[in-house]
Design a protein with these regions (language model features):
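Autoinhibitory N-terminal propeptides
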Residues: 1-212, 248
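Short acidic alpha-helix initiation/capping motifs at coil-to-helix transition points
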Residues: 203, 222-224
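Beta-strand-enriched, solvent-exposed domains that form extended recognition/catalytic surfaces
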Residues: 216-220
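Protease zymogen maturation seam
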Residues: 225-231, 236, 240-248
Length: 248
């Protein structure tokens, strides 16, 4: 077998253009959703949303904070769609308010009728924007029908089956069988970067993350990859440590 020829790395000097996330749909495919009773479904989503924040406030008041560890000023929320339906993922994000889509994925679930595709999304919501989603629910339930007979935020609300806290495995994008358990494993961490170009990559963001890793006794490599809006580094952690990272 001939040896693989080696080439120099490609260096792209021109800053890239940032394009916002949009759901991938087949041409002409209809958005699949499940009809809902507005009052009942709105009440369910509101109760789940309020329960998430009540638990968050309780945990913040009782959990021991690690000295010198920077406090997280928001939570990660996991939105789950209905089986074999679409989740209106692009409407979950509002960057102007700091509400950021972090992960979108499709899982398979099984029941007595067979296997079903379930769309999921993880969104970061700042503490001071916790009422933003409640306002969307309120508009959905209380709005008057449009000329087409639809209601405000109807497509978004009807696409959501349930809302819960996002745990570390909600952020895992690799194979499920590769997830760390009790034994620490090397894995990539993609850190959000508020800057929009590689040149302006937020090194302080990574430095702060490494400080958190040190406080939690999590090993890491010093090499960093900078991309627009994301910084990538390697850490060696188990499931418990990954959850601690998300909690802090």
């Amino acid at each position: 077998m001939s040896e693989i020829q080696k080439h120099d790395h490609l260096l792209i000097e021109t800053p890239p253009t940032v394009i916002g996330f949009s759901s991938v749909r087949s041409f002409g495919a209809e958005f699949r959703s499940r009809p809902r009773n507005r009052a009942t479904h709105g009440e369910l989503l509101e109760s789940q949303w309020r329960a998430i924040w009540a638990k968050h406030d309780e945990d913040e008041a009782t959990k021991p904070h690690i000295v010198a560890l920077p406090a997280k000023d928001g939570i990660y929320v996991h939105f789950e769609g209905a089986p074999d339906c679409n989740l209106k993922i692009d409407s979950l994000e509002d960057k102007r308010q700091g509400i950021v889509l972090l992960n979108a994925m499709t899982h398979l679930s099984s029941d007595e009728s067979g296997e079903h595709e379930v769309e999921n999304a993880v969104v970061y919501v700042p503490n001071n924007k916790r009422n933003s989603f409640l306002k969307k629910i309120e508009d959905y339930v209380q709005s008057e029908p449009s000329e087409k007979g639809t209601f405000k935020n109807q497509k978004l609300m009807e696409s959501i089956e349930k809302i819960r806290f996002a745990f570390w495995d909600s952020m895992w994008t690799g194979r499920p069988e590769d997830r760390p358990q009790d034994t620490p494993l090397w894995c990539e961490v993609w850190l959000r970067n508020d800057k929009r170009t590689v040149v302006d990559a937020n090194v302080e963001n990574v430095t702060r993350f490494f400080e958190i890793c040190a406080k939690l006794n999590i090993a890491h490599k010093n090499q960093i990859l900078f991309f627009p809006e994301r910084n990538v580094c390697m850490i060696k952690a188990n499931a418990e440590q990954l959850q601690q990272l998300m909690d802090n």
